[in-house]
Design a protein with these regions (language model features):
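Hydrophobic/aromatic-enriched cytosolic interaction surfaces used to assemble or bind macromolecules
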Residues: 1-275
Length: 275
């Protein structure tokens, strides 16, 4: 499957642009933009054929679209919904990160990576399939691998710092959710769950809400991610939680261009770091 980029993005100008490739279980998406140029943001979804080997689909997309191998200012590889764990900075040891990830998740025989969570004084450790990691490392120029949780935490923390109440954030993906809790800028909960139907999400959210001792009268639930799923969940949860907010994108994101309207928040957050 071959597809083109904007006429503005050519191989001789590619070093002015930042590319982010978002890997997910059923395909990938990518964005390309120039941090110095307003409304230059381009975003595209690429679904993979069902039942086909993931690495075969990935290779086909890369080989049929040579712009993936161009020299960019920076290349990010976002690993979406991959297994992860968070380790306090004082307990983190590089040599043991694979053992810890295997012990705490189902990430067996995966290449182990980590991202620094500066504001949380912790490391996020995650796994990616060896074949996928090796192929991306060979095919892309100096790629930076980042878990999708990593770039959204600073945004959520900032929102929490401006609130006196506890806040529970729910990030809705196609087959999984991230639940993240903050209290005045301090991370108090983070975990991800797979789901098959909306009722599963309702159970996880209400269970975490109760376990965190959150107040129906003063604390807030914020939903973001898949728009239709957010609307459906809001209709159900408003019978249980008084303050529910559908989280929009940061106002500065609109400077990137109209494609941000269909872009996951983790990609946007990573892009805003470069502005």
């Amino acid at each position: 499957m071959a597809f083109g980029l904007s006429d503005k993005i050519t191989i001789d100008k590619s070093e002015n642009y930042i590319m982010s490739i978002r890997l997910r279980s059923d395909g990938l998406s990518f964005s390309v933009y120039n941090p110095s140029e307003k409304e230059s943001f381009l975003y595209k979804e690429v679904p993979f054929e069902r039942g086909r080997n993931y690495i075969s689909s990935l290779k086909e997309i890369f080989f049929e679209n040579e712009f993936f191998s161009w020299h960019y200012k920076k290349v990010n590889v976002i690993c979406a919904s991959y297994p992860y764990t968070i380790i306090p900075k004082e307990l983190f040891q590089e040599k043991y990160k694979t053992e810890i990830l295997t012990f705490t998740t189902s990430a067996v025989e995966k290449h182990c990576l980590s991202n620094v969570l500066t504001n949380e004084h912790a490391e996020l450790v995650f796994g990616i399939e060896d074949e996928v990691y090796e192929f991306c490392s060979r095919s892309l120029v100096n790629p930076y691998f980042v878990h999708h949780i990593t770039p959204i935490l600073p945004l959520l923390r900032k929102l929490s710092c401006n609130s006196l109440s506890k806040q529970l954030f729910v990030n809705l993906h196609r087959q999984s959710i991230d639940i993240i809790g903050y209290a005045q800028g301090s991370l108090i909960f983070i975990n991800s769950f797979e789901y098959k139907q909306t009722e599963d999400i309702v159970y996880y959210v209400l269970y975490v809400w109760k376990q965190m001792g959150m107040s129906q009268q003063s604390d807030q639930l914020s939903l973001f991610g898949d728009p239709s799923a957010c609307q459906d969940l809001n209709k159900i949860l408003k019978d249980y939680i008084q303050y529910i907010k559908l989280l929009g994108m940061p106002s500065e994101a609109y400077l990137l261009g109209t494609d941000v309207l269909q872009t996951p928040l983790d990609v946007i957050a990573l892009s805003l770091c470069e502005l």
